[in-house]
Each structure stands twice: as C-alpha cells, then as structure tokens.
C-alpha cells in the first residue's frame, strides 16, 4: 500500500481545521495561505493545536522583501516610495505579504523549532530577459537550487518555505 491510504486532505478555513479532525496530525502543508489572513498568529496557533508532538509544519508564504525587490528591479520607485499599497481589492496579489523575520519570530514564540528555510524563485522572477525563464530553464534551476538555502538569497525569494517541528513534550524548554 502507498502513503495515500494514510493521508487525509481537508479543505476548509484554516481557523476551522480543528473541528474536522479527531486526532492530531503528523504533517501540515500550509502553502500560500498566511499572506491572505489578517491574523496569522492565531492561524499558527490553530495549526499548532492540531499537530502531534514531533509533527512537522510545511509553511510557505509570500515574502514582503521579494515583493519590494521585484518592484525595485521593475523601476516602480513611486509605488515603493508609497509603501506598495494594494491597488485593487480583488486581485491575485496577496493582501498581507509577510516579513520573514516576523514570521520566524511568530513561529519561535509559538514553540516551533525551525528546521529549514528555503527561498522560492530567488532569481527566476528577477531576470530582465523573461524568455530566459523558459529558454535557460535547466541552468536557472541549477542555480536556484544551489543558492535557495543561503542568505541573502532566502530573503530575496518571492516566497519563503519554512519547515518547523512541534517538539516532543520532553523536548520543550
């Protein structure tokens, strides 16, 4: 049997996930959601409450630094000077791009042990010649993979992926 027999997928508001579970889970995939919620700390607390001790959170969020860098490279100086206000109510641009240091602090304050950080699209979105994203994909992928877990490139990624562990109760300080 494959692992899919041991998997359960729940589609609901993050704040409501506890009401859909009977027992704590081993792994939570929470990708591209944190930047859409007004109260991320309470969402992280909810995720903590449904994860078993020793379980892992896979968290990916839209990076405010990546947004700033993208706009600077594009020459959108006035927009950056204005604080990069969201232009339209209904758009695919997230409502709350997250500062990585703030997210890391929320995780640590919540008791999570950060295991790893990875920048996602640390070079791809900044290429001046957009055709290179396609035409030079193999070389770009190799370089993305080489640098995506090193600073300052982590912090320049358009998204940041964090793996964090909920300690076993005996591990807690």
Describe each PLM feature range.
Residues 41-56:
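A short glycine-rich, Lys/Arg-flanked "PGG" loop and its adjoining helix->strand segment in the class I
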Residues 2-16:
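Conserved SAM-binding strand-loop segment of SAM-dependent methyltransferases
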Residues 92-117:
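Short alpha-helix
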Residues 16-22:
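Short conserved loop adjoining the S-adenosyl-L-methionine
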Residues 32-33:
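Short catalytic micro-motifs in class I SAM-dependent methyltransferases
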Residues 116-173:
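A C-terminal cap/extension of S-adenosyl-L-methionine-dependent methyltransferases
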Residues 56-83:
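Conserved class I S-adenosyl-L-methionine
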Residues 29:
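A conserved beta-strand element that flanks and buttresses the S-adenosyl-L-methionine
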